[in-house]
Curated annotation (Swiss-Prot):
Main location: membrane
Gene3D superfamilies, per database record: 1.10.530.10, Periplasmic binding protein-like II (3.40.190.10)
Name by which UniProt lists this protein: Membrane-bound lytic murein transglycosylase F
Species per Swiss-Prot/TrEMBL record: Photobacterium profundum (strain SS9)
Protein task: Murein-degrading enzyme that degrades murein glycan strands and insoluble, high-molecular weight murein sacculi, with the concomitant formation of a 1,6-anhydromuramoyl product. Lytic transglycosylases (LTs) play an integral role in the metabolism of the peptidoglycan (PG) sacculus. Their lytic action creates space within the PG sacculus to allow for its expansion as well as for the insertion of various structures such as secretion systems and flagella.
Taxonomic lineage from the root: Bacteria, Pseudomonadati, Pseudomonadota, Gammaproteobacteria, Vibrionales
Region (Disordered): 482-514
Length: 514
């Protein structure tokens, strides 16, 4: 039979191999003709490289968080794909991973420097920061760039950073300038070592310095090396630039909508001016007083983050259960007598009753905040009401709307609260004169204390349990499913909890008063 003919059999085998190769070649040809954006959409995943630090990305009590992480979530949502975060502990691995195609985007709070824009596309800037030289408080302070060449201490910077690049330029003016470049580290670590006195000086971005001072108050500013510089995401320079074009569109949209301003407010709008004495006192209180009351804060926080209730209590009484003011408010939460009665507190000096009552009163204030305000912002409006009164807070919202601002965002309303002291504004309001500036300081202090507790916990614990650690080809990833269009909860807040709760993790070893 023909089927047993060796020549026919051989021909069939060759034909089958040729057909398979042709099909594979066709698939490859088709893949090569896809744009970068089409390839990402076809794969169903956008891979975002970032740095594991307090601003860009970290794993908190409620899962992944950070400014760059939240921006990446929104970008993945725009694409309709899963988000795969690839956080690294040092800068050295980010751009090489981008170049070899291991990630699609670098999103790590990095400066647009000359060498970076020569090799990569920079998306539109999403915030600005200057370069700051820092030293330990109480030690010798360099006051101008020339002082760094006096050999009165060692200047240490992250290898390959924009800070190192700036020093290379400065060396042309100051030939005696020297420094050490450290590869396996990041700015957060260098700032910590300066605070401990293990390093003399380092350079960090102004935003990182401000955040670090909340948990390392001995970090002191020596001088500003540069003016504000743009911070951006980066992508490879490809032939079609489709991904780059979409990033330009994306950042334009979130700037126009106000989403970017709200995220910036969330992550560093609370920083404000730095008070060395207050910060030192607060950190001492975290160590000496907070452990005694932590269980009660957790017990009565319910839907709140217990650290927020703790921050509120510190603002009110400095965690002193016997605190009494000349106006008659008293206890851990400094409740007035009418407020205490309204929440069932019989003894305001009983710390458990006071904490329970304070949390319940805040809950009541939040329930009165209009549902048009997103849930994560309601608490700031409620705290302002807690301090200055609900009517005055609503006056500030109405004034914000009248001046063309967004009365539903804390970013805009907090700018109008101090105006309630001025006659030309309060005489047109429903509730008249108010010490709105004090209410603003009250809320911002609580936000700072809250973030400091979080930062303190980060600095003194590990983000990951050993059971969660899995090494896959030396690469860590956090993969999230496609983020659905953000829908309003019944209280008007936006709900992305499903995306976070179903996160799949793998880890890399990279080298009140009134």
């Amino acid at each position: 039979m023909l089927s047993n003919n060796p020549l026919i059999t051989k021909f069939r085998e060759l034909f089958t191999v040729a057909l398979v190769l042709a099909l594979l070649s066709g698939c490859q040809w088709q893949d090569d003709n896809l744009t970068d954006l089409e390839k990402i959409r076809e794969s169903g995943v956008i891979r975002v490289g970032t740095l594991n630090n307090q601003l860009s990305y970290y794993i908190g009590n409620d899962g992944p968080t950070g400014l760059d992480y939240e921006l990446a979530q929104r970008f993945a949502q725009k694409l309709g794909v899963k988000l795969e975060m690839q956080p690294m502990f040092t800068l050295s691995g980010l751009f090489p991973t981008l170049e070899r195609g291991g990630i699609d985007v670098v999103a790590a709070g990095l400066t647009i420097s000359k060498d970076r824009i020569e090799n990569y596309h920079a998306a539109p800037a999403y915030y600005y920061a200057s370069q700051i030289v820092v030293y330990k408080n109480g030690q010798w302070r360099p006051r101008k760039p020339a002082d760094l060449a006096l050999n009165k201490g060692t200047l240490s910077v992250v290898k390959g950073s924009s800070h190192e690049k700036h020093l290379i330029k400065l060396k042309e003016i100051h030939p005696d300038l020297t420094w050490e470049s450290i590869e396996e580290t990041d700015s957060d670590e260098l700032l910590r070592l300066v605070a401990k006195g293990e390093l003399d000086f380092t350079i960090a971005d102004s935003v990182d310095v401000a955040l670090s001072q909340r948990i390392h108050p001995d970090v002191a500013i020596a001088m500003e090396l540069t003016e504000d510089e743009p911070i951006a995401w980066f992508v490879n320079k490809s032939t079609d630039d489709s991904l780059y074009a979409l990033l330009i569109e994306f950042f334009g949209e979130i700037k126009q909508s106000g989403e970017l301003a709200q995220l910036e407010e969330k992550y560093f709008g609370h920083v404000g001016s730095f008070d060395y004495v207050d910060t030192r006192a607060f950190l001492r209180a975290i160590e000496s007083k907070l452990p005694r009351w932590e269980s009660l804060f957790k017990k009565y926080s319910n839907e709140f983050d217990w650290r927020l209730i703790a921050a509120l209590s510190y603002q009110e009484s400095h965690w002193n259960p016997q605190a009494v003011s000349p106006t008659g408010v008293r206890g851990m939460m400094m409740l007035t007598l009418p407020t205490a009665k309204s929440v069932g507190v019989k003894n305001r000096l009983d710390p458990e009753q006071s904490i329970r009552g304070g949390a319940e009163y805040l809950r009541k204030m939040i329930s009165r905040v209009p549902d048009s305000i997103e849930s994560h912002e309601k608490v700031w409006f409620a705290l302002a009401s807690y301090n200055v009164g609900f009517g005055h807070m609503m006056d500030a919202r109405r004034l914000t709307h009248k001046q063309g601002g967004n009365q539903d965002t804390w970013t805009d309303v907090k700018q109008r609260l101090p105006l309630l002291r001025q006659r030309k504004y309060y005489q047109q309001s429903r509730y008249g004169y108010a010490r709105g500036d004090e209410a603003l300081n009250y809320v911002e202090n609580i936000r700072r204390y809250y973030q400091s507790i979080i930062g303190y916990e980060q600095a003194h614990s590990h983000d990951y349990d050993s059971d969660d650690v899995q090494v896959v080809d030396g690469l860590q990833t956090i993969t999230l499913p496609p983020v659905p269009p953000r829908q309003a909860n019944v209280d008007g807040s936006l709900n992305n909890e499903a995306a976070i709760s179903s996160a799949e993790k793998t880890i890399e070893d990279p080298g009140p008063s009134q």
